Amino acid sequence: YIHERDNWTNFRWDASEVSILREVVCRKQGLLYGRLSTLGFDSKLRAMAENLTHDVVYSSEIEGISLNEEQVRSSIARKLGIENVKYTAPSHYVDSVVGVMLEAVQNYDQPLSKEKLCAWQTAFFPTGFSEACEIEIGQYRTNEEHIVSGIFGREKIHYIAPSPDLLESEMQRFIAWFDGEDTVGSVIRSAIAHFWFVSIHPFEDGNGRLARILSDMLLARGEKSELRFYNISSQINKDKNHYYDILERMQRGDGEITEWLVWYMKKMIDALDEAETIVTTILNKSFFWQKAASVPMTERQTQMLNLFLDGYEAKITSKTWATLAKCSKDTAIRDIQDLVDKNILIEDIPGAKRPSYSIVYDAEDLTQFFTDVSIIEENGIQYLKALFKGKKTICERVLKLDAERYQKGDLPLANLLSKYCSYIAAGNRDL
């Protein structure tokens, strides 16, 4: 195994192959933070809260642990001081896990220590048990650690971690590197830290989650920001079989980790693309409420609009409204008609037998600003591509349902552009 080699942490990689992807990551980071600069502080906090919710939930899911997403979202919102969020009382465990993530990213510039790592690992296992098995918490493991799969008696060994008597020296070296000079850039350091930490495997359990938190810390240091708007955990969770396969190959290797760095940075690119979608949603939602703030609405109408503004994937119909709002269909029809009369909703196809509606983000017809509109697909994701005012090509990720409805003629172009491009038109009408 890799740790059995002399100077095993003198990792090597193909600089030309890695640098190409690193440049893509850095460019996308710059684009994301450029867009975020247009948001107010409250909107930035909401974007961060949504990202951290996904980070905490998916980082746990990678390890086979399911957390209640609404509890996580509520815990993060409360700790960040975000108001007007539907509150679901979080369990003590969820609060503890959220606390670890927030402590790490909000204090990214503080030194790492054994004590800090042990405290974080304890927070993951407050009862001292993992899957009904008692484990060592708050200290480095004192037992040999074999990473295995398969049924009892026919296990397959994937990796044997360093022996317990080596952990103190191995972790001292890791922590010194972690807090030392950055010579390769935060993106590559983030990937190396992840691989290095899980290869030491200092704790009996919780190593994967800690590795991902440490990766986020290094990215925060590189960006010099405690506000986190993208996470790699959700992308790893989508491809976790490949994740474990690459780790196993690298841990049986000789320190040449190009494959790991390439895979990791591709996941970062996916994470940044997903973050762009969240930011677009928040920008359009913010633009909508600036226009609609003075329009009188019931609490139910406001809650339902926010649900769809946040990207809930469904057509707005009286049936859907009644189901989600837990009200009668007659009440739903009255709610919707009232919003149509106030120019908050618009019927997609006037006179349709089963009418559906779209939110009016912008009262102006945006088809006058956008030409050459098409729906394209990349890696299973749909995008709206168009030319804005004959000068700038834009590409916005759209919900699969919206793409399908537009292509079938069920969703007018004006309504599609209003939903995904209002913030663009709002800030650039004088171009």
Task: Identify the meaning behind each predicted range.
Residues 1-389, 394-400, 406, 412-420, ...:
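FIC/Doc superfamily catalytic core
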Residues 428-430:
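Short, intrinsically disordered, charge-balanced linker/junction segments flanking boundaries
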